[in-house]
């Protein structure tokens, strides 16, 4: 897979580890990072790494390794404790997911010495509606300077559990407007905070520069701006294609 990744003509290559949670097989993460770095001695690309994890399994040794290899951390934060734990329950019901998240985040930032080493994304379930202000406040409390208010994608497990977590898109738009208004007011009062989707749209509208955001590219950036390599070697044009394959729809699989 790493050899195939370097067949890309792009001068910049970013390898992002997704899941499940890739920290459950951290030895494989290490192998891929080190193999990519070795191949890049000859390929001479601008090489970056990102690992997507809920942080629960990360320990100091892992984080020090990630820092050494400049592998950034992307995680999930859905809001205050009650909302985050509702959206993302752990198998062990006796564990406090949000408390673990906050403790691990502090540990990561302490090792890196930089708050920007870890970024967070939220998922908007029906339990999130009406609570965008609380969610934004929680991001600020935990030291994040931006949020990406995004609707639920109707693919994969989200589609499977739509009766529990889905909502009309009109409800999301209403909440998004309220959330964006709140963020604008925060900035007016001196708290720097960015709504990521609005920033992408405004950059496209007001400047001649591209954003690299595949969903907004025309023609579509799938299979061009990136490719998804699954655990079995299957290659998809986008993450949504991989999610659809979980339910036996292989339309967006490029090959194996």
Label the predicted regions.
Residues 82-102, 106, 110-235, 240-252:
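Radical SAM enzyme [4Fe-4S]-AdoMet core and its adjacent flexible, acidic
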